[in-house]
């Protein structure tokens, strides 16, 4: 199995070759529900794929969440990411990790 890692006191990550599974408390401090504290994320092959995911999601009833698509710096480096809430309120995202500069 994949050994767990932690980040702070309330974030736990399980990393494997196929992706990451994380358990965290909601960042906004509100109660955890299906739509707060849970995010389903998809790996994208390109920035264009992330933008297409976001545009199609919004066009089909999704709502803007966490701002416009763009670059974000995180503990694992820079990513290009887009979040939205689907019509049921679930938070979903698509993320592309650009190659590291050499």
What are these regions (language model features)?
Residues 1-4, 61-63:
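Conserved acetyl-CoA-binding loop of GNAT-fold acetyltransferases
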Residues 2-35, 92-96:
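Conserved short beta-strand elements that form part of the metal-binding/catalytic scaffold
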Residues 41-87:
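Vicinal oxygen chelate
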Residues 73-74, 97-101:
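A short acidic/small-residue loop/turn micro-motif
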């Amino acid at each position: 199995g994949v050994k767990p890692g932690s980040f702070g006191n309330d974030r736990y990550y399980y990393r494997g070759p196929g992706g990451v599974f994380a358990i965290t408390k909601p960042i906004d401090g509100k109660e955890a529900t299906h739509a707060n504290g849970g995010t389903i994320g998809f790996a994208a092959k390109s920035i264009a794929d992330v933008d297409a995911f976001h545009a199609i999601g919004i066009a089909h009833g999704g709502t803007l969440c966490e701002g416009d698509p763009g670059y974000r710096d995180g503990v694992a480096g820079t990513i290009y990411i887009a979040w939205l809430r689907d019509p049921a309120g679930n938070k979903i995202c698509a993320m592309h990790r650009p190659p590291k500069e050499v």
